[in-house]
């Protein structure tokens, strides 16, 4: 696309970053200055009743800066990158039609990628193939199927944990139906995002600082009633660890504690470690991201001013 045709597209802002990096605070600050409306890009914040463990913006923050695509699914429901792209495009069109600018804020990098590049059509689920995979898992175990996936599709196998039957089953199913691996199918993207996008990533300058913030925030969540929040989900009786909602960082570890599998101290340790691992994956994604402007979360005023400097011209 030429620079001229790009310039004629509506504007959008991406504000990406690892967990606990101050994305929400910066987005709320920017909304006071720029004609933006916020869209959440987070696979955990979509769930109702999961507020504390996801660090969902509180009522006061949402009053100051409403976020779209929050609380749109029950924890029993799935939500794919394709679902997100469809919903985000609809919200972006609505915001643009009102003469304002979509500001997409969050840390689910797969969602940002799907939105920016489009999605390749994957084969539809096949009940017979799925049943065959599940039967094999029942007989041999999911670790055996993970080894099989390593031989077929080592790239997907590296991304999928052996204890993640939903994603593991889907990766194998896609190969058995199409004869192609997930990376092969996703190399050809669908429709690119029809917006002129300014992309920012915010993070602390040092990994140690981010680790400290993650640990502090996890303890703050516990002090704010995180255990009671998960107990309420646990008591429903229809939720389990195969669901994406309960596999969210923090929730999975608290669930193991409530099931009596680990001690409270072990839950805290694992929760902090899992959150740090999530942040590491997010930063790895962002380091390979093209055209991103990095911001230092320890200098919030400077970060705000840098965004304004880059996008200020579009505010009028």
Curated annotation (Swiss-Prot):
It comes from Escherichia coli O6:K15:H31 (strain 536 / UPEC). Residues 42-45, 166-170, 247-252, 280-287 are annotated as: Interaction with substrate tRNA. HAMAP family: IPP_trans. InterPro entries: Dimethylallyltransferase (IPR039657), IPT (IPR018022), P-loop_NTPase (IPR027417). The gene is miaA. Its cofactor is Mg(2+). This is tRNA dimethylallyltransferase. Substrate binds at residues 19-24. GO terms for molecular function: ATP binding; tRNA dimethylallyltransferase activity.
